[in-house]
């Protein structure tokens, strides 16, 4: 809807506040031909970005961060209304966004090749942009996850076409207005950055298939990620997909700390986080104590209006999502799960649920993407690792123990992209490598690592000069 410096305004898709269920915006849905045109414009402007000096790319990113910092409250409120995320969590997302843009700016100046010794001449390498990056982003972090794609893309001199989730596109629209302002201020053609709103099965599909796209960076579900990977053919692809992220609690750990961490992490953004705790595997000697702490902590959570600073858990993104979670809870109980607390639904709200299950229960195998915390009893760390690895996912895992030798042995044994010791799987910093194995994805995010993904290495050899 922002193509070649022009806004295309139509009332094609309704956007709803998931808490009030009121219509808050109408956005444009590009059709396939419009999407192809947007990609073509992005491709025509790739040389503009490539030829910008590192200092100019740095300035673009720092100016974007500066403008966001002046509108922090607006962005936080927008995220809370658009997604249903509690305002205190939305403010953290805005702060992380600023960090990610500033880190991207730093790496714009740090991009460099190397010199290789040779007796036959001079060998050196250059880092060059890929060309056109297609960024496809989800609803749950509608500002920060965009930044993790477009920040490194700009830093490395790529032109960008962004396709945000149509469920929560407003933060992306506000961000695009800032980018428009910065590009105009710096006298850079606006066609280097294009915003393509609409339905994923049209816009996202075309971005993944189109030959003018050099790289697709996607965050979302496994099913769509697999489709993008298939469509992309020889394109470079990074996929940050789902997970059922285990948290192992051993009897020698700080049980109360582990329980607090599990509750805080599981119910962040109503469980709509790809690295949310998927299941807690607890040694049987401390299961009763751990479960008591979990229930006590869960009872203290405040459910309600995302704009209230006291709220800990807001709604899911839609009533349909909440109904899906309600049905998953019922199915889990039918399979023998014991519901200890919560699980009731009111429109898009789900009261945080805690369920005792075994490893054959469906909640041990899937990504719930909702406020449901499954607890499993295990005999020892070996059984915990075995259950954790018996999964198609491999995003992040957490281990609580006071024995560093056990911790390192378990970290070596777990088949996951990231292992958090004495922290939940939900831990993430914007400058650390982030990504999964197995069905949880391809490639790594984290600004430095995304910068590496968005470059090509060119080798130059000089003889006899």
Curated annotation (Swiss-Prot):
Domain of life from the UniProt record: Archaea
Active site: residue positions: 240, 274
Keywords assigned: NAD, Oxidoreductase
Catalysed reactions listed for this entry: (S)-lactaldehyde + NAD(+) + H2O = (S)-lactate + NADH + 2 H(+)
CDD domains: ALDH_LactADH_F420-Bios
Pathway recorded for this protein: Cofactor biosynthesis; coenzyme F420 biosynthesis
GO molecular function, one term: lactaldehyde dehydrogenase (NAD+) activity
Sequence positions that bind NAD(+): 220-225
Listed InterPro entries: Ald_DH/histidinol_DH, Ald_DH_C, Ald_DH_CS_GLU, Ald_DH_N, Aldehyde_DH_dom, ALDH-related_metabolic_enz, Lactaldehyde_DH
UniProt KW NAD keyword: yes
Keyword NAD listed: yes
A Pfam family this chain is assigned to: Aldedh
Enzyme Commission identifier(s): 1.2.1.22
Matching PANTHER family: ALDEHYDE DEHYDROGENASE
Subunit structure: Homotetramer.
Protein purpose: Involved in F420 biosynthesis through the oxidation of lactaldehyde to lactate.
Family the UniProt entry places it in: Belongs to the aldehyde dehydrogenase family.
Name by which UniProt lists this protein: Lactaldehyde dehydrogenase
Organism this protein belongs to: Methanococcus maripaludis (strain C7 / ATCC BAA-1331)
């Amino acid at each position: 809807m922002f193509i070649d410096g022009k806004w295309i305004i139509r009332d094609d898709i309704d956007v709803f506040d998931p808490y009030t269920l009121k219509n808050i915006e109408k956005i444009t849905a590009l059709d396939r031909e419009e999407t192809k045109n947007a990609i073509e414009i992005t491709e025509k402007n790739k040389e503009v970005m490539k030829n910008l000096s590192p200092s100019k790319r740095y300035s673009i990113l720092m100016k974007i961060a500066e403008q966001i910092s002046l509108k922090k409250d607006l962005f936080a409120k927008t995220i809370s209304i658009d997604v249903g995320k509690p305002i205190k969590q939305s403010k953290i997302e805005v702060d992380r966004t600023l960090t990610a843009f500033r880190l991207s700016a730093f790496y714009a100046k740090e991009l460099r090749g190397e010199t290789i010794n040779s007796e036959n001449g001079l060998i050196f390498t250059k880092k060059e942009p890929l060309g056109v990056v297609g960024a496809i982003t989800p609803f749950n972090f509608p500002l920060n996850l965009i930044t993790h794609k477009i920040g490194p893309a700009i830093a490395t001199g790529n032109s960008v076409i962004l396709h945000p989730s149509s469920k929560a596109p407003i933060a992306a629209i506000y961000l695009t207005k800032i980018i428009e302002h910065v590009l105009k201020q710096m006298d850079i053609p606006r066609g280097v950055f294009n915003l393509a709103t609409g339905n994923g099965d049209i816009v996202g599909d075309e971005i993944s298939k189109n030959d003018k796209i050099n790289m697709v960076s996607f965050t979302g579900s496994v099913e769509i990620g697999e489709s993008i990977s298939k469509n992309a053919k020889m394109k470079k692809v990074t996929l940050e997909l789902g997970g059922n992220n285990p948290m192992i609690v051993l009897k020698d750990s700080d049980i109360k700390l582990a329980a607090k961490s599990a509750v805080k992490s599981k119910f962040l953004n109503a469980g709509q986080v790809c690295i949310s705790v998927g299941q807690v595997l607890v040694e049987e000697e401390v299961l009763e104590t751990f479960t008591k702490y979990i229930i006590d902590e869960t009872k203290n959570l405040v459910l309600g209006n995302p704009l209230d600073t006291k709220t800990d858990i807001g709604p899911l993104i839609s009533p349909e999502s909440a109904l899906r979670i309600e049905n998953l809870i019922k199915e889990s109980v039918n399979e023998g799960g014991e519901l200890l607390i919560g699980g009731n639904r009111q429109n898009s709200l789900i009261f945080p649920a805690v369920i005792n299950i075994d490893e054959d229960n469906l909640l041990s195998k899937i990504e719930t993407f909702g406020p449901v915390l499954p607890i499993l009893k295990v005999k020892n760390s070996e059984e915990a690792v075995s259950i954790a690895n018996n999964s198609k996912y491999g995003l992040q895992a957490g281990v609580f123990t006071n024995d560093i030798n056990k911790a390192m042995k378990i970290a070596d044994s777990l088949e996951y992209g990231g292992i958090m010791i004495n922290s939940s799987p939900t831990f993430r910093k914007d400058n650390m490598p982030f990504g999964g194995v197995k069905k949880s994805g391809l490639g790594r995010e984290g600004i430095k690592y995304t910068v590496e993904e968005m470059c090509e290495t060119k080798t130059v050899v000089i003889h006899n000069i």
